[in-house]
């Protein structure tokens, strides 16, 4: 398909033809066209044309938003464009482009900030008009600007665009000296928004392969009419003195003419420069075999342009529909019809024949087939897993992830000790994290995962401890038999390749569980604070209590007598903890203070104060900073008592009077019931469900194709390693671990290498094992910080739990839809679940999830809390049941579709402690 555009004096006529000798490689599908292209015809046409190198085109639907695709991509090349305008006796550089535009301000002598090019419709019409009559020279063999200039003036003279007497004057003008504008780039107000601090020159100089376009535009009153020439060099060459940097030149565009010619030379020059900076137009210009295809490329560019009527824009928010409309137009623009274009999403041309990406969850039909595939896929890269760690970015990731892993270890350790009466605590959790983390990083198929303790496991430990206590069974011994059954279950699941079941866990189930854990965190925080107020009550006047016999500030000993059948009796003495004045108020201040500091630093991270790297660093370490401040406050207030984190000295267990480092499977203080050894398979199945959910979903998130990891994942092998280590860990009385979603995603993000630009694109991930090993080892060594850890107030950790519970709600679609229940329809977001589904259906879906959430909460608060994972699994068949009955497939795709886009750059209100599964 070709576009034949002819221009009269004041009107543009647009006419499409269907006899194209060279189909545009990227062209919008015309109305009524089915989109079926004759690939065989394209191959025949390709054979008849001159050989053209293979082209690589990004096919990511969001690629047009990124710099690397906004700029020209030919293999590894990017397009760099300079606009030079004739001013007196020299050419002055006034603009430059690498996808985005920078303009030189002669008044200040500085370059302005980068911005999206904006063009007048008149300049495009003028450009199209003069291009239809100008000189177009394709595949010129020249290595100097003088050779190009001579060819241009001769071609213009031959076509009658200039008079013979004008030839020498035009040649002298084209060869005038060039004045490069070397002023500093001006920083815009609010200066560290990524779009504004993007630098064209930095992007140009840091890119390995660049090709340049020179645009020369200016007024020459000696000419009779405007003259235009477009030159495509056969080979890109460095032309000395032509550009401000030694970049190979591929295209040269010349536009000169009289001031009375009816052409705005500045705007027309900017329009041509913007065209050359557009990767689709530049690609078509590179492939065009004749003049007509080049003019058609301009028509294609205009087809995708948007004209804003000359009305006042009172609010920037009014431009949002334009942005959404432009995204749709740009997606429609990517219509490949030329087999010379190799679609690889940024891959090299020689990678076009690579095998399609293997599905790691595909079943082989043989026992342990999935695990064997995981091992073959990953272990062939084992040596590179260590050599790839020789990168400074890995060291930076280790330091960052260490604090990201240490804070939850301390927080969960303190809460675990409180829930289990110190049968397990900080020391056990830190040692477990250290040993299991090192082993996992050393042999796992996906060492990018960070393993650790999590909220769901804490809920299970609390429920299992309460069950054992009610049955007068030794909790720490029962965990051994649960661990043994865990190993048996995981071997069976891995043997039958059961990891494929993760495909059935949709957003419907994930978000219900996510909000449940968040609510548990919030509830437990205020529950603990309430217990402190009860143990240390507030009294209006303390003085009269000094002489009272019922002084609440002294320990109270109460006796409980138990009579036996043989006539003997046992006297139990219960010592109630002494109540302290001001403890409750100080505890509340420490809890909310820790929460608000962490929350403020989270907001500060996405604010405008301080340079971006410093601000983000402070925000990333917000939780440790908040804990440190609360320690300082607690130390300065000496007269008030607060409960501190209990940490044993050295490698001692948390409760040395009740247990040691090795647990006797047959019982520590009394024989373990034989029936319970077999019955432990039930809690083992439940805790396996939790580990399976967290680990497999985390692996699914980290291993998404959009992250461009190349060494494979380990759904089967990693699950076997995790659960087997947990089973062995039970013998030593240390916690089970699972893949921690937040820490794993943060680890992957820290190891990700991004392209430069206002909307960076993932280039690769430094997949290696060293960072995971070092982080785990450093967490283990941190147990030596016992003197410092003992200074942490427990209520400060409650504040962190409140922080984790509240921030984890951010970004959960179910929570957003719950808020929409009280939001007017006109304020609904532009997301598919709110715009493509009726309001009643959307609210019905939300209410179903809320009913499931309520049922799970009732189970959690009842004596059957151990059954929580089983009840959670029941939401999977429920989701299948409502599909096709209450909701159509299209509605479910909008309401329950998984988000395939990787969120690397954190949005406002989002940080490393947020997670779908806290």
UniProtKB/Swiss-Prot annotation:
Q: Where in the cell is it found?
A: Cell membrane
Q: Which regions span the lipid bilayer?
A: 393-416, 425-445, 449-465, 475-495, 508-530, 584-604, 616-636, 677-697, 714-732, 733-750, 770-790, 791-809
User: Which Pfam families has this protein been placed in?
Assistant: Band_3_cyto, HCO3_cotransp
Entry keyword set: Anion exchange, Cell membrane, Glycoprotein, Ion transport, Lipoprotein, Membrane, Palmitate, Transmembrane, Transmembrane helix, Transport
Using the UniProt annotation, give all residue ranges assigned to the region (Disordered). 1-48
GO molecular function ontology, one term from the record: solute:inorganic anion antiporter activity
Indicate which residues are glycosylated according to the record. 546, 568
> Which segments are annotated intramembrane?
848-878
Residues with lipid group (S-palmitoyl cysteine): 852
Q: Cite the ranges annotated as topological domain Cytoplasmic.
A: 1-392, 446-448, 496-507, 605-615, 698-713, 751-769, 810-847, 879-918
Catalytic activity line of the entry: hydrogencarbonate(in) + chloride(out) = hydrogencarbonate(out) + chloride(in)
Give the protein name, as stated in the record.
Band 3 anion exchange protein
* Organism of derivation: Oncorhynchus mykiss (Rainbow trout)
The gene name reads slc4a1
